[in-house]
Every structure is written in C-alpha cells, then in structure tokens.
Amino acid sequence: MQLKKKKFESKISLSKDARDGILSFCKMNHPNEGILILRGKAKRGNVFIDGLVVPPFSETGADFAGFPHNPLPLDPSYVGIVHSHPVGSAEPSLTDLNNFFGLVSMIVKSPYEDDDIFAWDSDGKEIPLVVV
C-alpha cells in the first residue's frame, strides 16, 4: 500500500520581537553578511518564529555567512536560518540553497527595513511571510 503525503501550503509567521532582532543584527553586521538560527514551532506547513540564536563558530564576510552544523545541540525548536545580503537581491543563491538548514531560509536585503525580509523553501520558492 502506498501512502500519499499531504502537501500543505506553507506560511511563515514572525513575531515582532524576532523581526526587530533580525533587522538590528543585520544592521550591526553591515557591510558583512550576518547569520542567525531561527527558533520556533512548525505545524502543517505553518512555521511560527519567535526566537533567534547566534550560531556557535559562525564565520561571516562581505559575501558569505555560515556555521558548522555538527556542534549544534539537537534542538527541535530550530526551524531554519536567516542571513543578510548586504548587496543585491534577497533571492537565494545556489550556495544558499545547498546550505539550507531546517524548514525555512530567510534572507534580508539592505537597507534592512521591515519590507526587506523574505522567506524561502528548500527549492528556492518564496513562502508568504507575516509579522504578528
């Protein structure tokens, strides 16, 4: 017997505190990229993000940001990552997609204002994002 996997429409809900923390972090790290782990809950395609974690041993530069995944504790509240693009668009690069972590990848483009945050799935498709 073959079971069909239900496909849910994804939606990302971001708390105002998390949004403000993301934007502040990106502004502080400019002109370098910044990277954070997103903390929250997921159910039936909906992801609610209410916390941020600075990844241990992260490295950033003008055109890269990353961290090794192996020293991370096993934490089911880690739902994805967010990083900044100081120059250019907020679309994920091939490198971004190849280093996908969790359920969602958010990218913030300069000048790091409320409308400069975008969410993507592992296929590079944009996911609707609302601030709550």
What are these regions (language model features)?
Residues 1-78, 86-132:
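Conserved beta-strand-loop surface patch within small alpha/beta domains used
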Residues 81:
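Conserved, mostly hydrophobic/aromatic
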